[in-house]
């Protein structure tokens, strides 16, 4: 099963994919770059991105639902997703951020139970109202160890303005 998964879910023949899989093998150059990048990640980026995320959490927790990492743990913060009251509020804030030059992403427009790759699963097509609601209310905002404090201040200010938290 592991061998199959590491080659895109390959079955007994080359084009017979029997499960979800991936190809995560690195060539020598990719491995060399990654070795240097991992050192920078350990020495600087992990701590710094957690500081950026903690600042978002502190400044936004009273106006949107923010992600929580248990005490004593770190996250690599591939994304920082905030949860709004409803889809309309999310879309309004997203448009406002984009008008002000702030990129955003909706990484989860629909739940896994709604994605074709899982149509063979028992939950495919089922109504999962909590999952569906979260997908409609979630927005990823910029997070990076290199995000400047003044840029983060602007993002925070714009979100607070549009959610009415500054009133």
Walk through the language-model features, giving the residues of each.
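PLP-dependent aminotransferase class I/II
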Residues: 1-167
């Amino acid at each position: 099963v592991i061998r199959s998964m590491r080659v895109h879910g390959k079955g007994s023949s080359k084009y017979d994919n029997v499960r979800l899989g991936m190809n995560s093998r690195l060539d020598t150059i990719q491995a060399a770059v990654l070795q240097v990048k991992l050192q920078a990640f350990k020495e600087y980026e992990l701590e710094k991105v957690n500081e950026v995320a903690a600042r978002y959490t502190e400044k936004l927790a009273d106006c949107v639902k923010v992600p929580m990492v248990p005490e004593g743990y770190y996250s690599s913060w591939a994304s920082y997703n905030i949860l709004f009251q409803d889809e309309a509020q999310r879309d309004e804030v997203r448009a406002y951020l984009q008008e002000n030059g702030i990129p955003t992403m909706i990484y989860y427009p629909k739940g896994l139970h709604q994605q074709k790759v899982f149509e063979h699963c028992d939950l495919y097509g089922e109504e999962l109202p909590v999952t569906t609601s979260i997908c409609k209310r979630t927005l990823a905002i910029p997070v990076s160890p290199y995000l400047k404090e003044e840029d983060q201040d602007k993002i925070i200010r714009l979100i607070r303005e549009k959610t009415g938290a500054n009133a």
